[in-house]
Every structure is written in structure tokens, then in C-alpha cells.
């Protein structure tokens, strides 16, 4: 998720990068962007010394000021709202595909005579692709811009949706799902970057909320998969034809959507202002793309093994993210087998994520107020630990919701009780994900692209593991104790949030990459 390095726009003291490195190579005519003290992405001296030959990527956004009149953060509110809504809606579209896969699973098991574990490969390979895609699609979006990556990845995504719809064997379906996951990962990295392009520091919470909310709306894929797959006039293949139709609609919208990458927007503005030819198709080389991709990957691996904050949060988020797919499997033995609901009614219970995010919306202003108050208390200095103020309370909803679902899913207890437990779990789950992502970008502003990549890789790999582990657990344990086991496993993880809130500043003080104190330019607010 390379592009999420812009999720939190951090004002920091400028360094003095080389002029040649600051040139934005987007066309034949290179115009130096408007510079100021407020760098969007500043590379740490430590990093430059050790990676002098691969630092092009880190310099990409250096010196671009949000005070420039052409900067996307200075656009009209309606234009920014449209871009945020469209970009985050893409996340809903891409992620309803792994959510509708349970509707496909039974059909492909019967069609190609597969075991239950093998039949899950389509879903798990999609999630694996989402984990791997940002490692090279992220740097590509910083070279070509958000718009071209959106359109290009969507075209490939739609092509392989057609491949899934016409699959002649299971291998074709699995390989196509893997490629769909890789190119569909733009719904994580590119979307987060585009949202950060148009929203400043003070508004980032709301942008991340929309990012998380559209993830919850993707849960509509569960009943959609059941309804379409069970319709004899449609069958499971029509789920992928629906993806093709909706994907074509998104392609058309993005063709008429403006570019948001500040480097390109400012470049074109300066070219127009000076009467120079405007470069609408950025130039780049495969060598430069390879260098930038290598930089993100190299630093991501280095950060994961050398920074305990990132590695611990990444593993925690792998558990958190994996439980979403765990409960996608758990709803069937509970609501179909215990409560005797129809397939459609049982699949609709997975949409408990949507009211959970609506509830989060009501408390988002409180989190923003607490965050601003914390900055005032610390002399207007951004403190990453302030992202966890509300999390200290939300984190307890994680085991509470899991245990409610585990031990209240019984015939003599109304199903609404277990649904409330599932909703409480989702409230905690989505809030923790949002808080951890913002914490990582705040704590590692100089290498945030690689830090987020290091954070997200184990997160999605955890989801891959839980897809297969959950099926194994439910085949060998009853649903009550299978769910209780993950509930007990979540208890020690509560300590991690408290440890980072109270001792995170001391841990960051020992890091060469983490930021201890990030000054805020109050004049900009």
C-alpha cells in the first residue's frame, strides 16, 4: 500500500534535497514545483546514507507544498467530496468479490469435485494478490499518477472477471482470482493515496472513515453471492459478469475524473501558466519503476524486522483482518444450522459490519476533538499515540463481541443477541484498523510508504491463513468453542494497544526511522 504514505499530510522541517532529484519527470518540459518549508514526504538522513542508489522514490514528493494554488487540497469541497466518494466506492466494488465467494464455493465444489479446503483457494488467492499488489502498483502510481493506474488496473481486473465467468476448470478460476487480487489492490493503496491527495491533516480522520466504511459496505457481497448463485437462471458465473458490468461503469467514471497526484497536477499547472506544452501522458522507464519498487520492498522488509512497532501492529492487524473472514465462515453453522435461517437470511447477517461503521460515525467527532486537544496539550506537536485515545475503550469490544457471539449462539437465545455481539466485534475491528493505519503513518512520516507496506503485508497474509484455518476449525470443533478460541487469543493483544499508548514515545525514541516529534504548522490551519 505504497500510496497511503499521504494518508496523514505531515508538516515537517525541510531538508535540502538535490535540485535534480526534485525535478518531476513527467514530460519533456520539466518545471520545478512550488517549494516551501512544508514537505509532504521527507527522507531520513539515515535512509539516504544507506540507500543512495535507490532514493528516487523517496524524493518523489519532496518539496511539494499544499500552499501551491494548484494543489488538490485547495480544490472546491464538492470536487474533493466527489473524488473521495468515487475512490472509496471502488474499494467496495473490489472487496465484495472475496465476500461473495462463499456463494461460488459450493457450486465449484460440485462442478469440479473439490474438497472444502481446495475450493477456498479462489478466495485466499484473491486476498494474497491484494497483499502483493501494492509492492509494485504503489510506486507505479507515483510515476504515472493515480488516474492511469486506476484505469489500467480496472481494465485488467475486468478482463480477468471475464476469465472467471468463462472458467473451464478450477485452475483457470484460481489464477484469474489471484491476478484480480493483485490489480484490485489499487482499491487499498491507490484509493488511500488519492484520498490523502485531496484532504489535509485535520480532515484525514474523515477520509479514513470513508475508507473503512466502504470496506464494511463490501459485506453486501455475501447475500449477493448467495442470491445470484442459487438462482437457476443466473448461476455463480453471473457474479463475475456483474463485476464486469460494474467495472466498466467505474472505468468510464475514472476517465472523466481529474488526476489528484500533487506532483502531476502542479506540473501541468506550471506548464500551462508558462505557455509550455502540457504532458498528459507521463514518461517513465522500466528501470526507474524497478528501482522504486525495489526501494519500497527493501525498506518494507527492513522495517518489518527492525521496527517492533510496525511488526507487532502488522501481526495484530493480521489477526484482526483474518477474523473478518473467520466470521464469514462462522455465520453458516450459526444462522443456517442453529437458527434454521434460509441461505439468504444467513448470508445477510454478515452485513452487521455496516451498522457497526454507522455507529463509529457518531463517535468520529469525539475522536477528532480528543486528537486536537492532545496536540494543544503537547505544544501543537503531532503525537501518534493520540490516535489510540478512543482505542483504549474500543479494544475491549473485540473479545466482548467474540464471546457474545460464541456463547449466545444457541437455540434458546434469540439470534439478535449473537448479532449484537457480531456488531460490537465489527465496531472494535474497524476502529482498530483505522487507528493502527493512522498511527503507522504518523510515526514513520519519512518512510511511510514502506512502513505501511510492512504493516499491510502480514495483515493480508493473516487473512489468507484464517480463510483456510476457519474451515478446518469448524470441521473439527463446534462453533461455540471454535469462536471462543479466537476470543481467548485476542485477550493478550489488548495489552499491545495500552503499551503503545503509554510507552510508544519511548519505543520510537530508540528507532532511527520513527519520528519522535513532528511539528505542526498552525498557520496552515
UniProtKB/Swiss-Prot annotation:
It is found in: Membrane. Belongs to the major facilitator superfamily. CAR1 family. The keyword Transport applies. This is Uncharacterized transporter C576.17c. One of its GO terms (cellular component) is cytoplasm. It comes from the Eukaryota. InterPro entries: MFS, MFS_dom, MFS_trans_sf, Sugar_transporter_CS. Keywords: Membrane, Phosphoprotein, Transmembrane, Transmembrane helix, Transport. The modification Phosphoserine is found at residue 55. One of its GO terms (biological process) is transmembrane transport.
Amino acid at each position: 500500500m505504497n500510496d497511503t504514505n499521504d494518508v496523514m499530510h505531515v508538516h515537517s522541517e525541510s531538508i535540502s534535497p538535490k535540485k535534480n532529484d526534485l525535478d518531476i519527470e513527467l514530460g519533456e518540459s520539466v518545471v520545478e514545483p512550488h517549494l516551501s518549508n512544508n514537505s509532504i514526504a521527507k527522507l531520513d538522513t539515515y535512509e539516504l546514507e544507506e540507500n543512495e542508489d535507490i532514493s528516487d522514490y523517496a524524493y518523489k514528493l519532496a518539496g511539494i507544498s499544499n500552499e501551491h494554488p494548484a494543489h488538490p487540497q485547495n480544490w472546491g469541497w464538492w470536487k474533493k467530496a466527489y473524488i473521495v466518494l468515487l475512490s472509496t466506492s471502488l474499494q467496495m466494488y473490489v472487496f465484495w468479490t472475496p465476500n461473495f465467494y462463499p456463494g461460488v464455493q459450493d457450486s465449484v465444489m460440485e462442478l469440479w469435485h473439490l474438497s472444502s479446503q481446495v475450493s477456498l483457494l479462489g478466495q485466499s488467492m484473491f486476498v494474497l494478490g491484494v497483499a502483493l499488489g501494492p509492492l509494485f502498483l504503489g510506486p507505479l502510481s507515483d510515476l504515472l499518477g493515480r488516474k492511469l493506474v486506476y484505469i489500467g488496473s480496472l481494465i485488467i481486473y475486468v478482463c480477468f472477471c471475464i476469465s472467471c465467468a468463462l472458467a473451464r476448470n478450477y485452475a483457470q478460476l484460481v489464477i484469474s482470482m489471484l491476478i484480480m487480487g493483485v490489480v484490485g489492490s489499487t482499491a487499498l493503496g491507490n484509493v488511500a493515496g488519492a484520498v490523502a491527495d485531496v484532504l489535509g491533516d485535520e480532515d484525514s480522520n474523515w477520509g479514513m472513515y470513508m475508507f473503512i466504511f466502504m470496506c464494511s459496505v463490501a459485506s453486501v457481497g455475501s447475500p449477493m453471492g448467495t442470491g445470484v448463485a442459487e438462482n437457476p437462471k443466473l448461476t455463480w458465473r453471473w457474479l463475475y459478469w456483474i463485476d464486469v458490468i460494474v467495472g466498466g461503469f467505474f472505468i468510464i467514471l475514472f476517465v472523466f475524473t481529474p488526476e489528484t497526484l500533487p506532483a502531476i497536477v502542479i506540473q501541468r499547472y506550471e506548464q500551462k501558466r508558462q505557455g509550455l506544452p502540457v504532458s498528459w501522458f507521463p514518461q517513465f522507464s522500466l528501470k526507474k519503476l524497478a528501482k522504486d519498487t525495489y526501494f519500497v520492498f527493501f525498506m518494507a522488509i527492513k522495517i518489518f524486522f527492525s521496527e517492533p512497532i510496525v511488526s507487532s501492529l502488522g501481526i495484530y492487524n493480521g489477526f484482526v483482518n483474518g477474523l473478518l473472514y473467520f466470521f464469514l465462515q462462522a455465520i453458516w453453522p450459526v444462522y443456517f444450522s442453529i437458527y434454521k435461517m434460509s441461505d439468504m437470511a444467513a448470508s445477510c447477517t454478515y452485513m452487521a459490519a455496516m451498522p457497526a461503521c454507522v455507529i463509529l460515525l457518531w463517535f468520529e467527532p469525539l475522536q477528532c476533538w480528543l486528537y486536537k486537544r492532545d496536540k494543544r496539550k503537547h505544544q501543537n506537536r503531532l503525537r501518534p499515540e493520540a490516535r489510540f485515545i478512543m482505542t483504549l475503550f474500543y479494544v475491549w469490544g473485540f473479545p466482548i463481541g467474540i464471546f457474545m457471539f460464541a456463547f449466545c449462539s444457541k437455540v434458546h437465545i434469540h439470534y439478535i443477541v449473537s448479532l449484537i455481539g457480531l456488531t460490537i466485534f465489527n465496531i472494535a475491528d474497524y476502529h482498530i484498523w483505522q487507528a493502527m493505519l493512522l498511527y503507522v503513518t504518523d510515526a514513520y512520516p519519512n518512510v511511510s510508504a514502506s512502513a505501511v507496506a510492512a504493516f499491510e503485508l502480514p495483515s493480508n497474509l493473516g487473512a489468507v491463513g484464517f480463510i483456510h484455518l476457519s474451515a478446518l476449525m469448524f470441521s473439527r470443533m463446534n462453533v461455540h468453542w471454535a469462536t471462543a478460541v479466537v476470543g481467548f487469543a485476542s485477550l493478550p493483544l489488548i495489552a499491545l494497544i495500552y503499551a503503545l499508548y503509554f510507552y510508544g514515545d519511548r519505543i520510537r525514541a530508540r528507532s532511527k526511522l520513527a519520528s519522535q516529534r513532528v511539528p505542526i504548522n498552525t498557520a496552515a490551519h
